[in-house]
């Protein structure tokens, strides 16, 4: 299956690594954007100044608890008011999200460091 290569826009900047991983895992641009907008869990990324968001694949409710067998993850970086992000001598525009990587996780991943509430509020203001 040949997937369409995502184009950079005013809202999203796609790295070559993220495009490669999208092809590897069979993820479309629309699905990655959906994970960013409608995530189930949000954590600090393993890279400095990044955020990782997760959306479960086919969640089911068993005995009143939400369960699933696979997860979709997206790691991205958004430019803050005091940050300057450079990409090949081009500054990322205000409110543009740089998508660094995407991946599928088989199973339920353990919760790592959740983002503090005050930082989540600051991110939502952007």
Across the structure, where does each feature detected by a protein language model lie?
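Ribonuclease/tRNase effector modules and their secretory precursors
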Residues: 1-126
């Amino acid at each position: 299956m040949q997937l369409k290569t995502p184009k950079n826009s005013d809202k999203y900047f796609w790295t070559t690594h993220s495009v490669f991983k999208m092809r590897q895992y069979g993820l479309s641009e629309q699905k990655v954007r959906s994970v960013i907008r409608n995530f189930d869990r949000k954590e600090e990324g393993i890279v400095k100044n990044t955020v990782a968001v997760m959306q479960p694949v086919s969640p089911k409710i068993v005995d009143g608890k939400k369960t699933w067998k696979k997860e979709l993850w997206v790691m991205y970086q958004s430019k803050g008011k005091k940050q300057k992000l450079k990409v090949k001598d081009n500054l990322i525009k205000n409110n543009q999200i740089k998508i660094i990587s995407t991946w599928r996780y088989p199973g339920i991943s353990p919760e790592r460091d959740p983002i503090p509430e005050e930082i989540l509020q600051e991110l939502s203001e952007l």
